[in-house]
From Swiss-Prot:
Location relative to the cell: Cytoplasm
Upper classification of the organism: Bacteria, Pseudomonadati, Pseudomonadota, Gammaproteobacteria, Enterobacterales
Recorded superkingdom: Bacteria
UniProt pathway: Nitrogen metabolism; nitric oxide reduction
Name used for this protein in its record: Nitric oxide reductase FlRd-NAD(+) reductase
Main location: cytoplasm
Organism name: Klebsiella pneumoniae subsp. pneumoniae (strain ATCC 700721 / MGH 78578)
Family statement drawn from the similarity comment of this UniProt entry: Belongs to the FAD-dependent oxidoreductase family.
E.C. no: 1.18.1.-
UniProt keywords, alphabetically: Cytoplasm, FAD, Flavoprotein, NAD, Oxidoreductase
NCBIfam families the record matches: PRK04965.1 (NF003437)
Entry GO CC: cytoplasm
Catalytic activity: 2 reduced [nitric oxide reductase rubredoxin domain] + NAD(+) + H(+) = 2 oxidized [nitric oxide reductase rubredoxin domain] + NADH
Protein purpose: One of at least two accessory proteins for anaerobic nitric oxide (NO) reductase. Reduces the rubredoxin moiety of NO reductase.
Gene name tied to this protein: norW
UniProt feature coiled coil, ranges: none
Length: 377
């Protein structure tokens, strides 16, 4: 007997897929398997839990049982999938197995932990469960080091600073948000973080961590060292591809899918942070929403093809919020930047003076949707 559509994962992508399937078909069997509790929470809220004084349990929006009842699902929480037998269409754990008609991998992404001595001392905040394990140490910590000055690193740095903690950010790059935009566009946020008291140690290499009586001793390049109470790894995410790799699926940066979200095995699909679409991994909410809508149609034999319009990425740094869109990392763009008291507008144009990317901040974010319409993709 088949378990119908089997979904591995229970995060935002998996839940959006379930909701879209149930809008179209109330009867088709749906089975979800995940290693966590499968309770619903809003993952972006993890960037603000410290300043809000929240505990991990405070984030829960809906229990797994309520979700299963609402959408008529079979759930298997706290279950580690050990293998996918693609030839026989079986998903296996150490004490169970499920036969699928179609399988969806919504396995998300895992935090990158720099390979340095003492790396086991680093905390991560990529899930409610991870925050639950770290919350006591983080709330008690007075001195916090954040490894990584990207999107999550900047959000956490501002949040910890707003909570009254002494915050240091270490990053190899010469500017914050270096993977998202040029320094001309990120300098306003960089200045604001410094103004708030965040100590930015850019162009700096982390060399090791050691627990001492006074805290965690952090060794840096050029024979520098600092001591902190907690270290948070925010150096990026890596798509979780291990199950897909063992199943013989095509892997690049993520699990490679076509415009139907189908992997190299026609019965297996991938969705969310683990999926690589047109050579790109898109770990943002809007592409996941659109992907879930498209995939629900394909799983129900209604041909759907994913077409992604230009989309906004929001940097949730409350004291200086940013929106960006387009290919902000293109080397051939000329940036026209207008900075005023009420905010910044940075436009990246190509040799033909066509708008290819933009960044807006603060009150100027209201111009984002008009600029989106002008973007040439």
């Amino acid at each position: 007997m088949s378990d119908g559509i089997v979904i591995i994962g229970s995060g935002f992508a998996a839940r959006q897929l379930v909701k879209n399937i149930r809008k179209q078909d109330a009867q088709i069997p749906l089975t979800l398997i995940a290693a966590d509790s499968m309770d619903e929470y809003n993952k972006p809220d993890l960037s603000h839990v410290i300043s809000r004084g929240q505990k991990a349990d405070d984030l829960t929006l809906q229990s797994a049982g309520e979700f299963a009842e609402q959408y008529t699902l079979r759930l298997f929480p706290h279950t580690w999938v050990s293998d996918i037998d693609a030839e026989n269409r079986l998903v296996k754990s150490h004490d169970n197995q499920w036969r699928y008609d179609k399988l969806v991998l919504a396995t998300g992404a895992t935090p990158f932990i720099p390979s340095v001595p003492g790396r086991e001392l680093m905390l991560t905040l990529n899930s409610q469960r991870e925050y639950g394990a770290a919350q006591s140490q983080l709330h008690d910590a007075k001195r916090v080091l954040i490894v990584g000055g990207g999107l999550i690193g900047c959000e956490l740095a501002m949040d910890f600073c707003r909570a009254g903690k002494a915050v240091t950010v270490v990053d190899n790059s010469a500017s914050v948000l270096a993977a998202l935009m040029p320094p001309e566009a990120s300098s306003r946020l960089q200045h604001r973080l410094t103004e708030m008291g965040v100590h930015l140690m850019l162009k700096t290499q982390l060399e090791g961590l050691e627990q001492t009586a006074d805290g965690i001793r952090v060794s840096l390049d050029r024979q520098r060292a600092i001591t902190v109470d907690a270290v948070v790894a925010a150096a990026g995410l890596r798509p979780e591809t291990s199950l897909a790799r063992h199943a013989g699926l095509q892997i690049n940066r993520g699990i490679v899918v076509n415009s139907q979200l189908q992997t190299s095995d026609p019965a297996i699909y991938a969705l969310g942070d683990c999926a690589e679409i047109n050579g790109v991994v898109l770990p943002f909410l809007q592409p996941i929403l659109l992907s879930a809508m498209c995939l629900s149609k394909n799983l129900l034999a209604q041909a759907g093809e994913l077409k992604l319009p230009p989309m906004l990425v929001k940097v949730k740094t409350p004291d200086l919020p940013l929106h960006l869109a387009g290919d902000t990392r293109r080397d051939d763009l000329t940036w026209n930047i207008v900075a005023a008291k009420e905010g910044l507008v940075a436009k990246g144009v190509d040799a033909e003076n066509q708008l290819r990317a933009f960044v807006v901040s603060e009150d100027k974010m209201k111009e984002a949707f008009a600029l989106l319409k002008q973007l040439v993709s």
